[in-house]
A protein has these predicted regions:
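Helix-loop-helix connectors at the membrane interface of multi-pass transporters/channels
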Residues: 76, 103-132, 166, 223-227, ...
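A generic transmembrane alpha-helix motif of multi-pass inner-membrane proteins
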Residues: 384-460
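Transmembrane helix-loop boundary segments of multi-pass membrane transporters
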Residues: 31-35, 39-40, 114-127, 150-160, ...
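Membrane-interface "cap" regions at the ends of multi-pass membrane proteins
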Residues: 1-28, 32-33, 37-40, 50-58, ...
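Membrane-interface loop-to-helix entry segments
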Residues: 110, 129-180, 234-238, 365-369, ...
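Helix-loop-helix junctions that connect adjacent transmembrane segments
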Residues: 1-2, 40, 117-129, 157-286
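TM-loop-TM module centered on a large, flexible mid-protein loop between adjacent transmembrane helices
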Residues: 72-75, 112-117, 203, 235-300, ...
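Hydrophobic transmembrane alpha-helices that form the core helical bundles
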Residues: 31, 42, 51-138, 142-146, ...
């Protein structure tokens, strides 16, 4: 396997996966539920939590550098093969479904430039023209990654820099237009009629999703030129993303009063740019949104393909997915991922169904590995500092699972259950020496039993 990803490429991978479409709607989303005071508290709590998680990943890359693809291997090493498989399966499934949403968003954003009241070309990203365009983009990225992860990561670095340009312009203009009196207007949100701590909770329900992707460098750590860069890249990307989110949300409240900002249609950053620089502002943000989502899609495709590949090399996924091509790209895993994305795109067009519930449930599955990162560090830590970071990361991971909805976690067993067949088949393809132990049999039984009421609740 090639080990060519340097610090800049790893940092760009993490930053690009976190900075997707959400940042462009963050001003309105936050203003609708919270005052400036609540925002400051919410960002403070979340910032501390995500930094603890980033530090946990950094520490693990230093004390267990031999564990490549941490999201899967940390869970496997710490809690057994079945837990490791479920971590990898849930992460991969979430990445596939999220990639479908990215492709839909790209062509929904393109409709800003193409659609008129008389002509609906791309619409909400689910017209046949959108599906054709999304399919073309899907396979262009597919063959790009087949040329080598390093090539794709280099292009992702350029895309990350490109997506930072409109965000940087927005921040500069917002600083120039910022008025402290506007920012302090109803500072504690009396007009919302909700206590400050309730507002804080509401902000954190939004904030918890904007750092999904923090694990990017850890996932591709096997391809890092220097293992020490993995932890550095994670920390640098988290600090950069946190800075962008803070500036975008707080400065916006100094440009437009909170009640007015809460009414701006999304992506609200476009409306603010029109306020600050005229009609061209909307075009700049629409273009920035497209570039940003394309970059995030590229990052997530790299990570989605890496997880089954690494799981297969550790005998958790069927042996075929351990194959690489001549350019050391995880070819079999990439084909699996993108064929699944293509099928989902076709189903969206054929059924016209709303897959937001499925996306929410799958997103819950990506939070479980975050908790397991903290739990693994807590399990193996020897120094008081490492134990403290592990405890903090565990608490943050549990908060993420609680805040995103325990019911969705229960429903996620519907998606875990089919994975058990993959797990059992993988053991057969690898001529696995170990039969199922008692713990694994109990866990499989619990998942199968829970999947019955969960399926009924989902379809009922």
């Amino acid at each position: 396997m090639e080990k060519k990803l340097g610090l800049s490429a790893l940092t760009a991978l993490v930053l690009s996966s976190m900075l997707g479409a959400g940042v462009f709607s963050l001003p309105q989303n936050m203003a609708a539920v919270a005052s400036p005071a609540a925002l400051l508290i919410g960002w403070g709590i979340t910032g501390a939590g995500i930094l603890l998680l980033a530090f946990a990943m950094l520490i693990l890359t230093r004390i267990r550098p031999e564990l490549d693809g941490g999201i899967f291997t940390y869970a496997r090493e710490g809690f057994g093969e079945l837990i490791g498989f479920c971590s990898a399966w849930g992460y991969w499934l979430c990445a596939v479904i999220a990639n479908v949403s990215y492709l839909v968003i790209v062509f929904s954003a393109l409709s800003f430039f193409t659609d008129t009241p008389e002509l609906r070309l791309f619409g909400d990203g689910n017209t046949w023209q959108s599906i054709v365009g999304a399919s073309a983009l899907l396979w262009i990225v597919h063959f790009l990654i087949l040329r080598g992860v390093q090539t794709a990561a280099s292009i992702n670095l350029v895309a990350t820099l490109a997506k930072l340009l409109p965000l940087g312009l927005f921040v500069v203009l917002a600083m120039m237009m910022f008025k402290l009196d506007t920012f302090k207007l109803d500072f504690t949100g009396l007009a919302l009629g909700v206590p400050v701590w309730e507002q804080v909770k509401n902000t954190m329900l939004i904030i918890l999703w904007v750092f999904i992707g923090v694990e990017g460098a850890v996932v591709v750590s096997a391809r890092a030129r220097n293992k020490r860069d993995v932890g550095k890249a994670t920390l640098l990307a988290v600090l950069s993303a946190l800075g962008v989110y803070l500036l975008v949300t707080l400065l916006s409240l100094g440009v437009v009063a909170r009640p007015e900002l809460a009414e701006i249609r999304n992506p609200s950053m476009a409306g603010l740019m029109v306020e600050m620089m005229g009609p061209w502002g909307e075009i700049i943000i629409a273009a920035g949104l497209i570039v940003s989502v394309c970059g995030a899609y590229l990052s997530w495709t790299i990570m989605a393909a890496e997880v089954p590949f690494l799981a297969a090399t550790h005998k958790a996924f069927p042996r075929i997915f351990a194959r690489q091509n001549a350019q050391a790209a995880p070819s079999a895993s990439l084909w699996l991922t993108n064929i699944c994305v293509q099928i989902c795109l076709v189903l969206i067009w054929l059924t016209g169904s709303d897959y937001n519930t499925l996306l929410t449930i799958a997103s819950e599955m990506i939070l479980v590995p975050y908790f397991l990162v903290g739990a693994f560090l807590l399990k193996i830590a020897t120094s008081p500092l490492h134990k403290a970071v592990g405890v903090g990361a565990c608490i943050y991971g549990l908060w993420l699972l609680y805040a995103s909805g325990p019911m969705h976690l229960l429903l996620s067993v519907v998606l875990y259950a089919p994975g058990l067949l993959v797990f059992l088949y993988a053991r057969k393809t690898h001529t696995h020496d170990n039969v199922l132990n008692r713990q694994e049999m109990v866990l499989i039984g619990m998942l199968l039993i829970a999947s019955v009421p969960a399926t009924w609740m989902l379809v009922g």
